[in-house]
């Protein structure tokens, strides 16, 4: 035990703060994230696959370019480019124009420039037009954030317990939840604490907080830790970077210190949406539990299943997992279960539902004991989150430390306007910005995996140290990229939205949105990677002309914080020329990777065939791996999600797989019922259905003609059959001499509107039927068809009809 550590609960807050500051000066704080163990496995992975890393390919290309003459890279510290960047606040001036400026290479901070020697003006007119323009649209994210705060501090009415339970059950069935009835009162929860000593934590955890450099709890930690220690269910929401991981980790570790140690069991399950976030939470818990005997294991996809199975059989106290892999182990691994689970934690719950894990979450909740503590944490609260809360939590306490869409005050947000003429040079704009202004500790968010990989190659060939993080990499490569960026061995981390949630890397100065995020919520989580825990940070977003609506929504929420950054033409032109010269090397590297991928796939197939021959009996003797949903159910769920997305439904309109199955069975029963009808009724129903479809088509065509929109559409089989029958009827009339001549046809066209399509369909339908089926009211040669005398029941009826 550290002799310098002092436990002095009776001392003043100032003395404790001074002591902790002195301890911090004596010993550097540890980093909570450790991914170094995966770096060695990446080298072994490449050796096993007989492939080379992208960095080796880039170094080979650079060595070849040196022999053949290397393209000139723009210097970021040239004297002629001083004072090239100009930035102004949106609230400074009105009625200006955004004009391309130049980049400031002397300071990383954005300042206002008063030098107008080159005739460059800085303007935010587009931002103001979007704020005050016609037809403004309110952002859904703001409305959701405001709705999520309603009923936050209402107290639950006391009454008969049985009646309350019945009301809750009916609410759950109907999907309507009254916050005042469902959530417990948050009275007594305090969002302020001077030190961790006030939170009733044990000495080992206080030592761990001291080693990590934690001196004062954040608001969500101060409110969550005391309530979690009492075993209450919690629904927590706070801004990104507010310390949610430590908010649920510390009370969990405190409770596990007093567990029955004679019986090992899995007592805590933590679910995260991504593998990187799971690895980060696992590393954080190991750092906080370094002075205890609590064991924790990581269960995510992309890593060895056998190693994870052995770890689960050893019954660790805490399991940090992604939903799919933990369900796989619970169903297919022996001696692995959640019978003794005491705490279930859902981290980044909104992201879990966005990625389609709702069915997996419900299955895990079903497998967990009912008498458990459940904690749910999310940066934003949506309707789907509220539905999940009603299913998994029991009288939870809702804690909202900050507004869900509030960004840190230390964050400086900027916009780089990409004109339509410069969209082809967007990579050059990014390269110029990174060469001159933002040179280290930068996360660049790309929209696609292909774009992120291409940017990695461009940065490498330009002599800039960068790492990539996206779904095309193996899990070891993804974690190695995080470790390299954390150790500052690379200056840039080029990632997709995989890194947009929960990833907390100390010291990130800048976030660049190379591709504009899909909505304001995604923007919030991206820029939340910087300016964390009170530090300063910059967020730069590239906005094209097609992203004006999103820029308007961001500007409305950001207010005067949003600034306009101007990038000069000269450095962009130099970088565009450089990228053009590097295109041959980029295509060569991509071709090498493609060939390696094809070769590796062929080797895998050959190895698989050899193993099937050599170990045939062992392979076929293994039990088949099962899943909680069948292939049919998974297809139905995917189809329902696709239909709801294509129809543009809201979150409340998304149907489940069971509902989709019910609709399919209902349609099947209707078809069977129609099949058993008499032929006459069945044909009548079919004719009515065709008429309704024709009427709807006519209405759509009329609307399109009114709106002036004409689209070329192919003809369906029904239309072809209809036109064919119509032409055959017309030719038959002409053959019989009853058809109209050409002059009559032209006269009819000029005289007025002809019969509608519905009338023509009725006429065709009646002509196909016999006279008997057309009904008694049909006339032939203006004479009613007479019935025979034998068809009447009595002579009096025959006389009356006579």
Swiss-Prot record:
Residues 666-684, 776-802 have a biased composition (Basic residues). Residues 644-659 have a biased composition (Polar residues). A motif (Q motif) lies at residues 194-222. It is an enzyme of class 3 (hydrolase). Residues 429-573 form the Helicase C-terminal domain. Residues 90-122, 149-174, 572-616, 671-712 form a coiled coil. GO terms for molecular function: ATP binding; ATP hydrolysis activity; RNA binding; RNA helicase activity. GO terms for cellular component: nucleolus. ATP binds at residues 238-245. The keyword Hydrolase applies. It catalyses: ATP + H2O = ADP + phosphate + H(+). Residues 76-131, 138-169, 691-702 have a biased composition (Acidic residues). Residues 225-399 form the Helicase ATP-binding domain. SMART domains: DEXDc (SM00487), HELICc (SM00490). A motif (DEAD box) lies at residues 347-350. Its EC number is 3.6.4.13. The keyword RNA-binding applies. Residues 1-179, 639-802 are annotated as: Disordered. Belongs to the DEAD box helicase family. DDX27/DRS1 subfamily. The Q motif is unique to and characteristic of the DEAD box family of RNA helicases and controls ATP binding and hydrolysis. This is DEAD-box ATP-dependent RNA helicase 28. It comes from Oryza sativa subsp. japonica.
């Amino acid at each position: 035990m550290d002799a310098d550590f002092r436990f002095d609960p009776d001392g003043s807050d100032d003395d404790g703060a001074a002591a902790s500051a002195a301890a911090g000066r004596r010993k550097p704080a540890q980093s909570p994230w450790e991914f170094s163990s995966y770096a060695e496995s990446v080298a072994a992975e490449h050796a096993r696959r007989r492939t080379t890393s992208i960095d080796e390919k880039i170094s080979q290309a650079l060595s070849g370019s040196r022999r053949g003459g290397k393209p000139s890279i723009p210097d970021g510290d040239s004297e002629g480019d001083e004072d090239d960047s100009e930035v102004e606040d949106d609230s400074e001036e009105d009625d200006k124009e955004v004009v391309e400026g130049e980049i400031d290479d002397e300071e990383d901070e954005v300042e206002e420039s008063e030098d107008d020697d080159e005739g460059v003006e800085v303007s935010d007119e587009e931002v103001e037009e979007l704020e005050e323009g016609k037809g403004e649209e309110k952002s859904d994210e703001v409305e959701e954030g405001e709705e999520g705060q309603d009923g936050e501090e209402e107290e639950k009415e006391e009454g008969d317990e049985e009646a309350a339970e019945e009301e809750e059950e009916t609410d759950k069935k109907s999907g309507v939840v009254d916050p005042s009835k469902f959530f417990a009162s948050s009275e007594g929860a305090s969002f302020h604490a001077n030190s961790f000593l006030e939170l009733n934590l044990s000495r080992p955890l206080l030592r761990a907080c001291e080693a990590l450099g934690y001196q004062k709890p954040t608001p969500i930690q101060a409110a969550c830790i005391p309530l979690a220690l009492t075993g209450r269910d919690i629904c927590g929401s706070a801004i990104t970077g507010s310390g949610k991981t430590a908010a649920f980790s510390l009370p969990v570790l405190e409770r596990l210190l007093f567990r029955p140690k004679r019986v090992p069991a899995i007592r805590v399950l933590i679910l995260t949406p991504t593998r990187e976030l799971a690895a980060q939470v696992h590393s954080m818990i190991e750092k906080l539990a370094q002075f205890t005997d609590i064991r924790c294991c990581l269960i995510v996809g992309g890593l060895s299943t056998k190693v994870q199975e052995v770890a689960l059989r050893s019954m660790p106290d805490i399991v940090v997992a992604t939903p799919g892999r933990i369900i796989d182990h619970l169903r297919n691994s022996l001696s692995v279960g959640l019978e003794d689970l005491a705490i279930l934690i859902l981290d980044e719950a909104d992201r879990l539902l966005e990625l389609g894990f709702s069915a997996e979450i419900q299955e895990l909740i079903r497998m967990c004991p009912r008498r458990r503590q459940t904690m749910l944490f999310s940066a934003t609260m949506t309707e789907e989150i509220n539905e999940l809360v009603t299913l998994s939590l029991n009288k939870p306490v809702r804690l909202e430390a900050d507004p869900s869409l509030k960004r840190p005050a230390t964050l400086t947000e900027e916009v780089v306007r990409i004109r339509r003429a410069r969209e082809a040079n967007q990579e050059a704009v990014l390269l110029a910005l990174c060469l001159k202004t933002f040179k280290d500790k930068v996360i660049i968010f790309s929209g696609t995996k292909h774009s992120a990989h291409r940017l990695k190659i461009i940065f490498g060939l330009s002599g800039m140290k960068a790492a990539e993080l996206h779904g095309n990499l193996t899990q070891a490569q993804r974690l190695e990229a995080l470790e390299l960026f954390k150790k500052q061995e690379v200056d840039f981390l080029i990632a997709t939205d995989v890194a947009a949630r929960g990833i907390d890397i100390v010291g990130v100065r800048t976030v660049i949105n190379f591709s504009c995020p899909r909505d304001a919520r995604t923007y919030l989580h991206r820029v939340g990677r910087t300016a964390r825990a009170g530090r300063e940070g910059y967020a730069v977003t590239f906005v094209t002309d097609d992203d004006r609506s999103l820029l308007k929504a961001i500007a409305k929420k950001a207010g005067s914080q949003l600034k306009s950054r101007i990038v000069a033409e000269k450095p962009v032109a130099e970088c565009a020329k450089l990228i053009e010269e590097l295109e041959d090397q980029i295509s060569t590297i991509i071709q090498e990777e493609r060939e390696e991928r094809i070769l590796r796939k062929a080797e895998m197939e050959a190895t698989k065939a050899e193993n099937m021959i050599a170990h045939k009996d062992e392979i076929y003797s293994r039990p088949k791996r099962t899943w909680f949903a069948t292939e049919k159910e998974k297809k139905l769920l995917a189809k329902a999600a696709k239909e709801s997305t294509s129809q543009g439904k809201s979150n409340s309109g998304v149907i489940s797989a069971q509902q989709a199955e019910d609709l399919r069975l209902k349609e099947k029963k209707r078809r069977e019922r129609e099949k058993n009808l008499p032929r006459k009724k069945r044909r009548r129903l079919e004719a009515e259905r065709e008429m309704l479809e024709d009427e709807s088509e006519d209405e759509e065509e009329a609307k399109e003609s009114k709106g002036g929109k004409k689209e070329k559409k192919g003809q369906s089989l029904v239309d072809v059959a209809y036109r064919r029958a119509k032409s055959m009827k017309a030719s038959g009339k002409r053959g019989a001499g009853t058809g109209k001549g050409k002059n009559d046809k032209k006269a009819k066209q000029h005289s007025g509107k002809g019969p509608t399509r519905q009338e023509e369909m009725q006429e065709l339908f009646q002509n196909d039927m016999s006279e008997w089926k057309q009904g008694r009211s049909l006339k032939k040669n203006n004479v009613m068809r007479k019935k025979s005398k034998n068809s009447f029941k009595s002579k009096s009826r025959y006389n009356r009809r006579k």
